[in-house]
Amino acid sequence: METTTIHVMRHGEVDNPDGILYGRLPGFGLTDLGHAMAQRAADHLVSSQADIARVVASPLKRARQTAAPTARAYGLDVECDPRLIEAGNVFEGQPVNSDRSLLLKPSVWKYYIDPVKPSWGEPYVDIASRMRAAVSGVLRQVRGREALVVSHQNPITTLTRFARRQGLAHAPWSRHCSLGSITSFTFTGNTLVEITYEEPAADLVAQAADMTPGDSQAALKR
């Protein structure tokens, strides 16, 4: 039975001078360091002789830019799938790291009622469902080969927790999904047999700033 690997990559460092929670807002492309992270991933896939047959990205600019070097390396187009988009969040557009008082206003207390769902944004179950559907679609189309899928930290973390049969609710600071990281899902037929995690740009992450660094070496973007 054929073996298929779907490499799910988080985008590189984002150009966000005002330190806002950019979420699904338009714009917000990569910094020079972010572009270097994207190139590092492409070089890593080529050097490891990954048999990339498709490159699919979230429609957000930072994800498309991250996917571009790999697409060029393999002579492919970057396809977009809205199911790979960042998670919705009621605090989108606000400088939540530099002004923590925004999170303490009585008007937002209602968003903390259910952290398991979570009540401040898109439900984890919905994120897991759309990410699973997106990856399953790519799996069907690249049987016996490999693909690169570029998404965002929360969706990738939620998908990984779902695949490992862990609870979907989690603390953002615990996420093991650094900028430019690749979480690879390997299937035999339709059966998931292995999940691996790599950081081709680990040295660059240590120089980066991230709105949600998780457990990475990136600095907290303020």
Language-model features: locations:
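GST superfamily/GST-like fold recognition
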Residues: 153-157, 186
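Short beta-strand scaffold positions
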Residues: 57-58, 129, 150-151
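Glycine-rich phosphate-binding loop signature in dinucleotide/nucleotide-binding domains
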Residues: 47-51, 138-145
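Active-site signature of alpha/beta-hydrolase-fold catalytic machinery across serine-
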Residues: 69, 158-162
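Acidic, low-complexity terminal tails and accessory targeting/binding regions
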Residues: 1-4, 47, 76-80, 86-99, ...
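Active-site-proximal alpha-helix that buttresses catalytic centers in soluble enzyme cores
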Residues: 4, 9-79
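Short glycine/proline- and acidic residue-enriched helix-loop micro-motifs
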Residues: 105-126
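Generic beta-sheet signal
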Residues: 6, 145-153
